[in-house]
Amino acid sequence: MRTIERSSAFKRDYKRESKGKHRATLDDDLKPVLTALVTDQSLDHRYRDHNLSGDWVGYRECHIRPDLLLIYRKSDTVRLARLGSHSELFG
């Protein structure tokens, strides 16, 4: 089982999202994804998990909700890098 490491940017993003439109469901939406990541299970197809390229090469992205993305990297730990909408994360 992997451990979770949260970047400072992720912590800031999580705080923002927990006060925004996803506040009622954020924890419930994140829990199954994080459980799958730490236990090395593949994510359900609905999360649209895929590799990133460019500045984010080596990272993966999944859709927690249609307009809420999680950028992460798996190695010995699961590093949560960013959380937010596509426009917030990619400009």
Located regions from the model:
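Basic, Lys/Arg-enriched alpha-helical interface segments
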Residues: M1-P66, K74-V78, E88-G91
